[in-house]
Structure formats: C-alpha cells, structure tokens
C-alpha cells in the first residue's frame, strides 16, 4: 500500500480565521491499482498503435476510446512496457475514484513510483487535497511534474468510471495546466465529458478508436493460431467479417469453435446470439444502458446501415439523428459512416444479438419495422447524399435472419 494525506471536506471543521489545515485521514492506494497489468499468453502486439502513441507524445493528451473488449487496457499495458520515449505511470480507475481524494492519491502515488522520479522530488512528499483548494493542488502538481528529468506518460485506464463532477473537473484541469513533461493518456468506453473539441482544435489530442483497435484479418489469424486454433484462410475471413475485428468477439469465437463438433456449421451460424457472446454483450455492454437506449438499438438492428431518415421513420422520433449522435459519443456502440455522417452502423455481433432479442419478443414488431423500412426505401430518391457511403444496406427479414434483403442506396 502507498499512503497519501487528505484534508477535510469543503466545510472544514475549523474556523476560517485559523489560517491552517489539519490532517484528518490517510488514503491507502493498493499496489495493484498503480501496477501495469500483465499481458496474457497469446497476446498479439500492436506495434503500429504503440508507435502512434509514441508519435502522439507531443499532442499532450491521448484518448483510446472504444467499447468493451477492443483491447484498450492491453494495448496501453504493452505500450507502457515497450515505450522508450517516456516513462509511464499507471492508474486503473474504478468507481471508488469518484472520491477525488482517492483518485489523486492514486495519481500521485503512481507518478512517485516511477524510477526516474528523484527522491528529492516533491512527489514523494505528503499531499493535501481539499475540494475548495483544487487550483493550489494542481499548481503544485504541475510544478512537481515540470521538474522531472524525463517525459512522463500518465495512463488513466477506464476513465469512463468517473462520473463525479469534482473528479472530472480535476482531470479537466490536468488537460489545461500542460506541464511540458506530461503526456496524459486516457482510455474509455466512450468520450469522457472533457473539452475534447478544444483539444482537437489546438492540435493537442491524439485519438485511437474502435476502427484503429479492430484487428485486421492477419491479426485475427495470429490471435486464433496463438489460441491453439488452426483455421483455413476462408474460415478466418468469415470470423473476421462476423466480428468486425472485435478482439473479444474473436476470443469468444475461438473458444466456442474449439468446443464445437462441426466447425463449418458453427461458422455458418455464428452470431451475436451465441451464448458466450450474448453473455458478454449483455454483461459488459448493454447492462449499463438505460432501457430506452437498448430499445432504440433493437429497433435499428433490422438494418446493417441505417440512414438518419430511416431511423426517424423506424422510431417515429424526429430527434432520432440526435440520439444516434449521442449514442456514438457516449457509448461508441454506433458509428457514423461517410463524410456526410448521414448513416450509422451498429457493430455486427452486437447488431445480430439485438436483432435476435427483438425477434424473441414476438414476430409482430419486426414485421412492422420491416414494412416501415420498405416504405421508406421505396420513397427514397436521393440516396446516398453527397459524400455519403455508396455501398448497399441490407435489412434482415425477421423470418430468415441470415438472408439479406437488398435496399437501394
């Protein structure tokens, strides 16, 4: 355990005229919280992404953002071990860090534990935290960081766990004080509520998202082979297409294929409704969403690619486009396509799970939705818009979920 002092609440138990602070408690930081996670056997290194993080050191803030199961934590753990340009300090963020005293105790302890931090550094001292004295705390932290002899990458993993306004404001301050020695690296399942547009405009933000984290067919083949599974190139291509390169989906598929008596039949029917995949999707992704958001996703799951106008018709909500945009920003479960951002896609395994869930609730609703989609496409004369995606969209008929019904673009 590493300890760091904390001071009183915003209403201190001493007279304001006393002009002093009193130590009232100590925060214990578990060593595992500030230790870089180990890499599992069969780990597929992503040298190109590590190089991108190295190249982004001058950007000051790096954001690795994708839904659960895309390998964010393992990528950053690998980068932390292999980067030669910066030392790294690791903090695994969890819900308890919505107590800002715990969060910043862990941050200071992680930084102080870096070998390049000299023993004379202020970072090895006792630190005080008071909600009413955040500017002073961060000014002192910035000064201590500025004095470091080498650049430092501070990794806050799973920053989506932070919802407390004070804790988030502290991270926001850290993006503003800009000590020259610090690169702040955030991993999250969705965009954290920080000033990301401002950072982009200033050229201070480097981003890695699901599209970059998704495995290529070659990386998928390497992962499957290292899992002890030898498949033909055609079988690998099928799994890669079904999973979209989603790492967790590939791992779950590999385990299921090993246990299957008929590999070809499994690969033919593998979808997001496979039990192991469905359990992961529900437990790690969908359970954290409100029912209204889950229902929205179920409805749009009838099509591979959903233009905003079709979403409006399916949901009977004029603001469906705004909801899609919000889902993209806050969950990363849908992705806008094309320069015009006029259509959205749901990750394939998640979409097939949602479609099966919709069908289990009765045949009437899927049939009604397909009828709405058919009428919308029949009336659509100006698709794709300029700059929009040019390939076709397919809506799955509820009676034959694996048979495509091609709609005009």
Predicted regions and their residues:
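C-terminal boundary/linker of central alpha/beta nucleotide-binding cores
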Residues: 19, 63, 67-70, 74-81, ...
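Short, amphipathic alpha-helical segments that act as regulatory/interfacial helices
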Residues: 61, 104, 108, 112, ...
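Alpha-helical sensor/transducer elements of the RecA-like P-loop NTPase core
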Residues: 22-36, 45-49, 74-76, 105, ...
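Conserved phosphate-binding/catalytic loops and adjacent sensor/switch elements of nucleotide-binding enzymes
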Residues: 68-70, 74-151, 161-163, 215
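Extended alpha-helical scaffolding segments used for macromolecular assembly and cargo binding
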Residues: 364-409
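A short, basic N-terminal segment
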Residues: 2-59
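Walker B catalytic acidic pair
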Residues: 157-158
């Amino acid at each position: 355990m590493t300890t760091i002092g904390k001071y009183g609440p915003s209403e201190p138990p001493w007279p304001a005229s006393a002009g002093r602070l009193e130590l009232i408690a100590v925060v214990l930081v578990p060593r595992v919280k500030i230790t870089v996670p180990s890499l599992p056997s069969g780990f597929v290194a992503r040298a190109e992404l590590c190089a991108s993080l190295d190249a982004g050191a001058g950007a000051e803030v790096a954001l690795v953002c994708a839904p659960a199961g895309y390998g964010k934590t393992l990528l950053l753990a690998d980068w932390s071990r292999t980067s030669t340009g910066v030392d790294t300090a690791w903090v695994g963020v969890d819900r308890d860090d919505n107590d800002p005293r715990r969060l910043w105790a862990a941050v200071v302890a992680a930084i102080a534990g870096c070998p390049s931090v000299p023993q004379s550094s202020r970072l090895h001292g006792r630190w005080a935290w008071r909600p009413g004295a955040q500017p002073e705390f961060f000014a002192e932290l910035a000064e201590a960081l500025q004095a470091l002899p080498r650049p430092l990458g501070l990794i806050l993993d799973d920053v989506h766990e932070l919802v407390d306004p004070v804790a988030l404001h502290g991270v926001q301050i850290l993006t503003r004080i800009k000590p020259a020695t610090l690169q702040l690296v955030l991993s999250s399942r969705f965009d954290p509520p920080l000033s990301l547009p401002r950072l982009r405009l200033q050229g201070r933000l480097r981003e890695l998202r699901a599209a970059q984290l998704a495995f290529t067919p070659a990386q998928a083949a390497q992962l499957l082979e290292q899992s002890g599974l030898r498949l033909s190139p055609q079988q690998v291509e099928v799994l890669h297409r079904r999973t979209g390169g989603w790492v967790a989906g590939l791992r779950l598929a590999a385990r299921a294929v090993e246990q299957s008596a008929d590999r070809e039949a499994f690969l033919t029917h593998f979808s997001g409704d496979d039990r192991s995949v469905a359990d992961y999707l529900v437990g790690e992704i969908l359970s954290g969403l409100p029912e209204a958001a889950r229902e929205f996703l179920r409805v749009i799951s009838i099509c591979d690619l959903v233009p905003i106008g079709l979403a409006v018709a399916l949901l009977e909500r004029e603001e469906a486009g705004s909801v899609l945009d919000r889902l993209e920003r806050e969950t990363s479960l849908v992705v806008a396509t094309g320069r015009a951002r006029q259509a959205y896609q749901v990750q394939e395994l998640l979409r097939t799970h949602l479609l099966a869930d919709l069908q289990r609730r009765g045949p009437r609703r899927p049939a009604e939705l397909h009828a709405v989609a058919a009428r919308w496409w029949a009336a659509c004369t100006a698709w794709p818009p300029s700059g929009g995606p040019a390939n076709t969209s397919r809506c799955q008929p509820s009676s034959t979920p694996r048979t495509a019904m091609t709609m005009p673009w």
